[in-house]
Amino acid sequence: MKNLLICIIKMYRKYISPLKRPSCRFYPTCSQYSIEAIEKYGALKGTLISIKRILKCHPFNEGGYDPVK
C-alpha cells in the first residue's frame, strides 16, 4: 500500500504538477512531504499527516520550512 501511494504521488508530480503554476508555500513541497511522511510513518498515518499539511497550504498561511517530524 505504501509503495502504491508513493507511486501515485510521483505520477502526480510528473504529469499533473507541471501543468499548474508553482503554488506550494512550504519547503519541502507538499508532495515531497507526503512521500517522506508515508515512508517514515506508513500508509495510514503518513496519509493523515499529509492531508493535515495539504490543508495548511493556502494563501492565508505564510508557509516556510516544515519538515516531517
From Swiss-Prot:
TM segments? none
What does UniProt give as GO cellular component? plasma membrane
The answer to whether the entry has keyword Coiled coil is no
Q: Which InterPro entries match?
A: Membr_insert_effic_factor_YidD
Q: Tell me which Pfam families the record gives.
A: YidD
Q: What is its main location?
A: membrane
> What is the membrane topology listed in the Swiss-Prot or TrEMBL record?
Peripheral membrane protein
State where the protein is found: Cell membrane
Keyword Cell membrane, does the record have it?
yes
So what does this one do? Answer: Could be involved in insertion of integral membrane proteins into the membrane.
Family affiliation: Belongs to the UPF0161 family.
Task: Spell out the protein name for this chain.
Answer: Putative membrane protein insertion efficiency factor
Q: Which organism is it from?
A: Clostridium botulinum (strain Hall / ATCC 3502 / NCTC 13319 / Type A)
